[in-house]
């Protein structure tokens, strides 16, 4: 039996045969391959370690550089702080030295003054609160007079320079030297006459009264003739005593400012103003055509074409007021005057305001005696008054009420209460209001022109106030009066709440674009023939004014005593004369 070799049991026995395919590998083969692999791995690890070390060194270098930069920046900041501290210390030292120097200079002066002062000298500390009211009022008046005087000098110098420059510019293109000299000579004569007039104190005796043509709550309007040149003017007089009692200082100031600032053909022209101990005087152009109220009383109603003409001109007049920065607040037919060509002009700016502090009664009240304005002088519903009418409005038809209203219409204009028919509701309830309140008045006038009476008229002013405040329920269009859709729409868009009223956002342009004014030439409407042109027999013709209703009046305003002259503070600076109105309107 042959012995077989079994793997793992050692060498086969002697004489046995080993299988050919199980020959062992050559000696040392596995050891050689293992050594080569270990060598390559070691080299790779060394290379990686070198790269890692180099990266660590680079990062350390970057970090050290960053730290150095931070240290340098901190050092710079510390140096700057030290420099600032040094500068502050130097400034403090300089201030201390300057103060010491001043003290050293003052000490000899104080010593010299002390040596000059008598032994019984007593230091005095001003205490204005211990002075009498009369003394304080005189001090206020003196301060106001000085301020007004020097402001006027500066303003007149500026205006004179501007006029001279304008005159020279107008003749730069003159064809001949002769014409240029003639223009400048005429300008010099006008300037001389104007300066002479400014130096002359104007007085009531310079005018002759022709006729009284109007009365108001606080004064009257007279047709006067100037003695030296025979020119005709309208003189408005206001009693200072009444202005004081009714606290109308702000209204007087506002009216004068509007007329002085205006140079519009839609506003009555002011030539000059002055005052004396008793009265304030406004010398204005005379408009012989009367007022719109007289025309409404005479004709009852207007056609839509005539209404369109007058309302369009009123839009332009109100726009001119608003461009000056003022609000009229009392636009009504009484204050719409008609000139000799039949076109309208606005007047009576007693309730206007430019929202300037001097247009506030509270400002003057505080300035005069340190108290708030009297609430009774503010605009608002009147208190209950004795009813003079015996009519019961419940038993009167609308036509009868209008007839009664028309009879008393002019008398109401003369009273101190006035008529509230055209005033916007937001003014009565003391809400905030702006220029849109004048557009409400325009809507009320348009209603009266087309219908024949104001939209909220009543026998008593208090009833009118109530209707205006509740306009949503009381505004009604009569069934027997035909109005075009455009006219009724315009009235409704004017007689509405202030936030929805036409003209609130876009001003006059919104109203101009309304279909009711389609075809109106706004740029040249004053050049067209008016529907009504007054027929005048002379320059003093007053036939269009209700002078018969005024009764007999004296040639001069009534004279009365006025004991408190210290109350003239609000009237300082009232005197006015402007070169433009004195020359361009041929007043000289």
From Swiss-Prot:
Enzyme Commission numbers on file: 2.7.11.1
Record keywords: ATP-binding, Kinase, Nucleotide-binding, Phosphoprotein, Serine/threonine-protein kinase, Transferase
Region listing for Disordered, in residue ranges: 1-76, 100-139, 370-389
Residues at which ATP binds: 213-221, 236
Cellular component GO terms held in the UniProt record: cell cortex of cell tip; cell division site; cellular bud neck; cellular bud tip; growing cell tip; incipient cellular bud site; mating projection tip; nucleus
GO molecular function: ATP binding; identical protein binding; protein serine kinase activity; protein serine/threonine kinase activity
Ranges in coiled-coil conformation: none
Domain Protein kinase: 207-517
Function: Protein kinase that seems to play a role in the regulation of cell morphogenesis and proliferation.
Annotated protein name in UniProt: Serine/threonine-protein kinase CBK1
Species this protein is from: Yarrowia lipolytica (strain CLIB 122 / E 150)
Gene: CBK1
């Amino acid at each position: 039996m042959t012995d077989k070799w079994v793997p793992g049991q050692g060498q086969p026995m002697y004489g046995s045969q080993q299988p050919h395919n199980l020959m062992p590998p050559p000696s040392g083969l596995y050891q050689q391959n293992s050594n080569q692999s270990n060598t390559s791995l070691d080299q790779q690890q060394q290379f990686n370690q070198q790269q890692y070390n180099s990266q660590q060194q680079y990062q350390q270098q970057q970090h050290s550089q960053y730290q150095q930069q931070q240290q340098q920046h901190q050092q710079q900041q510390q140096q700057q702080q030290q420099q600032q501290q040094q500068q502050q210390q130097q400034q403090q030292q300089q201030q201390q030295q300057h103060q010491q120097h001043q003290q050293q200079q003052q000490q000899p002066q104080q010593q010299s003054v002390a040596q000059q002062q008598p032994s019984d000298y007593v230091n005095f500390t001003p205490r204005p609160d211990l002075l009498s009211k009369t003394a304080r009022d005189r001090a206020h008046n003196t301060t106001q007079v000085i301020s007004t005087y020097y402001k006027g000098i500066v303003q007149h110098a500026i205006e004179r320079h501007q006029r001279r420059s304008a005159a020279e510019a107008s003749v730069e293109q003159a064809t001949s030297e002769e014409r240029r000299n003639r223009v400048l000579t005429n300008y010099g004569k006008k300037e001389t006459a104007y300066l002479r007039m400014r130096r002359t104190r104007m007085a009531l005796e310079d005018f002759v009264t022709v006729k009284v043509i109007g009365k108001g709550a606080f004064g009257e309007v007279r047709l006067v003739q100037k003695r030296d040149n025979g020119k005709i003017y309208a003189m408005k007089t206001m009693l200072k005593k009444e202005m004081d009692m009714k606290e109308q200082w702000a209204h007087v100031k506002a009216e004068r400012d509007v007329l002085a600032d205006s140079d519009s053909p839609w506003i009555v022209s002011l030539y000059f103003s002055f005052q004396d101990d008793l009265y304030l005087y406004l010398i204005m152009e005379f408009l012989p055509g009367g007022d719109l109220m007289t025309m409404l009383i005479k004709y009852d109603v207007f056609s839509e074409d005539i209404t369109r003409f007058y309302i369009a001109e009123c839009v332009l007049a109100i726009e001119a007021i608003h461009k000056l920065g003022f609000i009229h607040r009392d636009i009504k037919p009484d204050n719409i005057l008609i000139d000799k060509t039949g076109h309208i002009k606005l007047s009576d700016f007693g309730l206007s305001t430019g929202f300037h502090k001097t247009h506030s009664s509270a400002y003057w009240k505080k300035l005069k005696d340190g108290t708030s304005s009297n609430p009774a002088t503010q605009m608002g519903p009147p208190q209950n008054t004795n009813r003079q009418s015996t009519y019961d409005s419940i038993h009167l038809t609308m036509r009868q009420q209008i007839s009664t209203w028309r009879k008393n219409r002019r008398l109401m204009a003369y009273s101190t209460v006035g008529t509230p028919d055209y005033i916007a509701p937001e003014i009565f309830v003391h809400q905030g209001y702006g220029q849109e309140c004048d557009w409400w008045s325009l809507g009320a006038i348009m209603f009266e022109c087309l219908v024949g009476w104001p939209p909220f008229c009543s026998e008593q002013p208090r009833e009118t106030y109530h209707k205006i405040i509740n306009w949503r329920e009381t505004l009604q269009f009569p069934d027997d009066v035909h109005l075009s859709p455009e006219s009724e729409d315009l009235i409704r868009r004017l007689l509405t709440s202030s936030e929805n009223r036409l003209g609130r956002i876009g001003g006059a342009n919104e109203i101009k674009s309304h279909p009711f004014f389609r075809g109106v030439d706004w740029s040249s409407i004053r050049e067209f023939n008016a529907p009504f042109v007054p027929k005048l027999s002379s320059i003093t013709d007053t036939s269009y004014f209700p002078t018969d209703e005024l009764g007999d009046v004296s040639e001069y305003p009534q004279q009365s005593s006025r004991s408190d002259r210290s109350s003239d503070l609000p009237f300082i600076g009232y005197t006015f004369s402007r070169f433009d109105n004195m020359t361009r309107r041929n007043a000289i």
